[in-house]
Amino acid sequence: MGERGQHRVATVDVPAGRFRMGDAHDEGYRTDGEVPVHGVELRAFSVDVTSVTNAAFTAFVEATGYVTDAERAGISAVFHSYATAPGEPVPETPWWLATPGASWRHPGGPGSDLTGKDTHPVVHVSHDDALAYCSWAGRRLPTEAQWEYAARGGRDGARYPWGNTRPSPEDPRCNIFRGEFPDRPTGHVGTVDVRTFEPNGYGLYQCVGNVWEWCADRFSARYYRTSATVDPTGPTRGTLRVLRGGSHLCHDSYCNRYRVAARSSNTPNSTTSNIGFRTVGDAASEG
C-alpha cells in the first residue's frame, strides 16, 4: 500500500475500563447471539469520532489508486427508493436491488455522485476495502467489544448511546427509517452528515443508525457463551464478519438493530448502500 497516509477523521481516546457487553433488555434476535450479557475489560484505545467519510476515503483512493470490491464487481446492493438505475431484486428482500454501476463513487447507481456528500459516511465498502484503508492510514477496525464499549459512551447497560429513551419523530436522535417500511417513508431516506445528532458520552457521533459499521471480528451467534473477558478479539473460525450499529434503513417492524448491543454480519466482500466503517488505534497513553 506504500507510504502511510493521513487519516482525515477526528479521533478521541477512550479510557480503559470494564463494561457489561450484550443485550440487557431482552430485545435482540436470538439468532444474532446478543446474550448472555457478560463482563468485558478493555485497555484504552483511540477511536474515530465519526464513521469514515467520503472525503477521507477519497483521499485514500487518490493516494493509492485503490479499486474497491464493488467497482471490480461492477455491481452493488442499493435500497430501491434511491436507486438511480434498474437492478435485480435480491431474493427474500426485494427492496434491495443488485444495481450495476453502484459503488462508493456512485452510491445510488449510475448518474448519482458524491455532490454535497463529502461529510457523509462512505458506503459500498466491503470488509476487505475497510482493511485496505486501515492499512494505509495506520489504523485498525475495532473489535466488536471495542465498538460496543465506545458506542455506549459510558452508559453501561443502556439500550442506546444516549440512554434508554426510544427515538421518536419528535425527538429522532438517530437516522433510521421513518414511516412504513419499506415503501412509505415519511422523511429522508439515505445517509446524512456524520455529525448529525448529539454525540455520546465519549464524543462519538451516530454509533447507531446512518450506516452499519464493520468490525474486525469473525461472527458467531454462540461466541458470547465462550468469549474471553479481557480484550476479546472474536472467534478464530468463520466466514462472516461482524457489523454493528444499524443503519438508516432500520425500522422496528423489520430491523430493530439500531441498539448498541445489536449484532449483524455479512461476508467480507459484501457491499451495500448502508454499510461503512470507523477505525481504532492505540491510545496516546498506550503509544
Describe every region a protein language model picked out:
Residues 9, 37, 42, 117, ...:
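Short coil/loop residues immediately preceding or within conserved phosphate-binding loops
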Residues 19, 24-43, 110-113:
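Short, conserved catalytic-motif segment at the N-terminal edge
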Residues 273-286:
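Short, structured beta-strand segments at or near domain termini in extracellular proteins/domains
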Residues 3-8, 12-13:
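GGW-centered surface loops in extracellular recognition modules
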